[in-house]
């Protein structure tokens, strides 16, 4: 007898196959960011290099461009750039994941691709807290078709814990470890977030070790993050990193400007003890970056991908039947107690025509240019020592009718500003990152049809800060300009590449 989840899997697969070609006419469908063929996408899940290929799973609702009962979508790549859509990996419907296959991870267990995920069950529609969440397993030999194995971890660290999700598993010596987020009740507030640590010998029988860290500890998180979602724990350089997505932090100055955040704490790990040594630091300064997940590439690089969207933001692409995409894969490094992120070198595969201008000097003036395509890579070096303009930078995706996305250095605020108030349909707001204390600022920019990603560096280090935001300009908004306001600005180098479309709407032949 077919299980309810198997029937749901077939329905999801049919919806996905029928939708692919329709997206080719969507003016905002990305050229090189992983995006669903149809429906809704949020958290990346199960990132792994397995049997010669990179696998990316994701939270997915294939029936409409809105959040619904979560499935696991699936894509694969050999180069981190060209991704092929695979059959839907998981669908809800069994007793242990009736209302959703929530976020989780993937591990290679002796050649078996093993997914550990949260089964979500709604007990009542009267309250968002009337839920039950358990940790489940599914396995695959071919890396495409998965067999559910049921619940492997049922009990949360404390009684009456409802929110208990997003497992992340790794192997250390002869033991498997798991971190998972959970929330305890707090009568004065919405709750208190924590990360629990478990240990197992076989991935099926888990023992609670301790609460690895929580918001009732001595951490400057405002002590009011009511949930810590999507935890990850790994080594980078000579430090251990606890990465997570806290919910409930209040905005403070330039910090915590989005509904929810995504960041990390550095510390020391001596199993089973994690000793934090830094405060919480946000990973990205843009409007749209959440639920980041990290994995190890075949050459040992630590690579990160995040959901390139945010819960409260408008999603104009819903009119075309899809919503959500992933950020570019980013290489992680640790420099001076800070994680720096740079786009993976494989992105250079997409470079086509190149345009180079060696030195551009402007004095209360503009330098216009035209882009051949909305798919662009830009490298700009700004000489701070030789410039005194109040504001200097770029206007991108302009159309001569007021539509533009502004990226500029503001000397009065000592910040780098991204202004998307005129960036197209239903997007507003300004975000910024610190201006590096350096003689020259390097801006590495990727423009897709509905996004901008900026990597900020100084004269020594690339990727000190990143700003990631969705934009929705008209398809003919292909003009740009350099500008300087109230003074002069020296741009030492201005390089632009038109990028090839990576054909992300392709459906893998392995799916047949």
Curated annotation (Swiss-Prot):
Catalysed reactions listed for this entry: Hydrolysis of terminal non-reducing beta-D-fructofuranoside residues in beta-D-fructofuranosides
A Gene Ontology term for the protein's cellular component: cytoplasm
GO molecular function: beta-fructofuranosidase activity
GO biological process, one term: sucrose metabolic process
Keyword rRNA-binding on entry: no
Catalytic machinery residues: 43
Superkingdom of origin: Bacteria
Residues spanning the membrane: none
Protein name: Sucrose-6-phosphate hydrolase
Organism: Zymomonas mobilis subsp. mobilis (strain ATCC 10988 / DSM 424 / LMG 404 / NCIMB 8938 / NRRL B-806 / ZM1)
Gene behind the chain: sacA
